[in-house]
Amino acid sequence: MYVVFEGIDCVGKSTQISLLKEIYKDAIFTLEPGGTELGKHLREILLNKTHPINKRAELLLFLADRAQHFEEILKINQNKLIISDRSFISGMAYAKDFENDLLFALNSFALENFFPQKIIFLKGDANLIQERLSQKELDSIEKRGIEYFLSVQDKLEKVLHFLKEKISIEILTLDAKESKEKLHQQIKEFLQ
């Protein structure tokens, strides 16, 4: 089973994934972008840009990472439990300048039509995002601010709705303000 955690920065995806690592010791844990050597380099380029990157070029860099990630991680482990911190879904939401049909077609190509079966979508409000962003050093994406994140979160919801029409997926939407223990319990039940 391929399980994906989605949500904007600061909603607790990494915390919940860490808790699952204690339970699912044989699972494959990965992340996008950055789950491969190529991905680590591309992530570094994209998060710490010193020169502006055109939106189309940025999209294609993420797609290159996704295709490599599929080949190195997802494809060879598709009969195991795979738990990923983000996926093509975030890619579609962050590439909000492009149409969903185009993004879906490009991602389908990069992933050879291998999609997650279950998605855990953690949602946060402006207060939660503000509080958590204030506690860390910000990368170039995080410096775009709360309004940017909330617009991406809105786009994530729209992408998830779009995908329900295209592929067979189960989605669990959770309020990131809940305690990490309560969220963990709900996630464990969803993965049963």
From Swiss-Prot:
Keyword Lipid metabolism listed: no
Cellular component, GO, one term: cytosol
Catalytic activity as recorded in UniProt: dTMP + ATP = dTDP + ADP
Residues the entry annotates as binding ATP: 7-14
Naturally occurring in which organism (per UniProt): Campylobacter jejuni subsp. jejuni serotype O:23/36 (strain 81-176)
PANTHER family, per database record: THYMIDYLATE KINASE, UMP-CMP KINASE 2, MITOCHONDRIAL
UniProt EC number: 2.7.4.9
GO molecular function (one): dTMP kinase activity
Family: Belongs to the thymidylate kinase family.
Name of this protein: Thymidylate kinase
